Each structure stands twice: as structure tokens, then as C-alpha cells.
Amino acid sequence: MAGLLAAFMLNIGFAKKTPVTLVIVLLLSIPLAGCVNDESDLGEITTVSMTIYHGYSIDNATSNHTIEIELYSGIAPSHVDSFVKHVNAGMYNNTTIHRVIDDFMIQGGDFENGDGTGGYAADWYGYCNGQGLDNVSNCTSPTYYTLPDEADNGWVHTSCKISMAKTSQPNTGGSQFFLIPGDISQHTWLDGIHTVFGEVVTGCEHITTLSEVQTDGYDRPILPVIIVSATVVANSE
């Protein structure tokens, strides 16, 4: 893709209950300077086990998958804190992977509407719909809580990474996330914009399999892809 002008439209939702379209223009497929995964200070590592099925029900699923994701508080403390709080509250259980694009990613985490228009941060991190506010009382509802961007952490969008979905505006990440398949080298146009906050350490081949399911014209799986459960299984420094 080097030297070619390519446009990519990424439909993602955030705290406002309307879909948002992010248009990313890729001029050159060249990695950002200095954007290499730095494992020198991962901080506390939280391991989340996630069970996912593809089909109309778990009993009649065409496939069942279990993956483990390591989350690194040292590279994206707010993102990890929010994600873990959502996991512990059961917010991701029985939610949809609402968007699937082969050779790109699978996206879920909209526990409000299940279609990419909902979700929010698990706590107050200083932003309300992307606007920095001094006081939480100035944000009209917890459903408008969003995350500060932590995309300058040196981690890039290579295979098996987990990253936070957001709009084209800064600091608008909430609860929606996307997982990058194992057959991808790097999505350079996302680096420095979306925050990578961990990686799939077990079962990344399942992300690749799920990224290849049949979808409709809106990138929605024809047969549902459902996160049955997400559970914290380990913590370590």
C-alpha cells in the first residue's frame, strides 16, 4: 500500500447514542518513528479470559473459542483500569461482537446497544464525551464518561493486540474495543491515534477465525458472534 492514497471508514460508537464515522486517510504505509512495543515497564499485568461463540446459541454454535488477554497498566493505566472494572462488573458478558472486517479486526464492547452506538468508561477519568472537565459534577451522566488518549505509549497495532475504539475526536474512548487477528503485520494508520492497552497471549488464532466469518454490507456477522463471558483470571506485577 506504500505510495498509494487509501481511505478507510471506521464506524464506531461512543457515549452519545448516535453512530460516528471516522475517516482515516493513509498516505504512506510507513511505521511511525519510535512506535515499537516497549516491554520495559508493563506495570501490573491483568489476565482476562474471554469465551466467545459464533452462532444463534451457545448450544448450537458453529464454533466456540476461549482467548486470554494480558492488559498492561504501565502502558495505558486509565484504559486498563476501565476495562478491568467493566469485566469485574460483568458488563461484557453476553454482548455482541458487532463488527467484523477480515484482514483488519473484530470489534465489541457496546454493552448498551450492541450495535456500536453505545458504551462508556467505567469510571470518571476527567473527560465527558471527549471534553476535559475539572469536576465530575459538570458531566451530566456517567454514560458520557470517556477515556483520555494514551496512544503515545509506544505500542502499535500489530497482530493480536487489543485497542480502544473511539471517534475521530480525541479522548472519546469508552468501552468498545477491537482485537487484531494473528495474520496481520501492522495497521500503521491507527498508531498514535487509538490506544493499544494489551495483547491476546492465548488463542489469537481464534481472533483470526472470527475475523473471517460471513458478514452483511454493514460488517455485521450474519450469525451472531457473542462474548459469553469475560473474567479476570490472574494479576501480577
What are these regions (language model features)?
Residues 1-42:
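Secretory targeting signatures
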Residues 35-237:
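Cross-family detector of peptidyl-prolyl cis-trans isomerase
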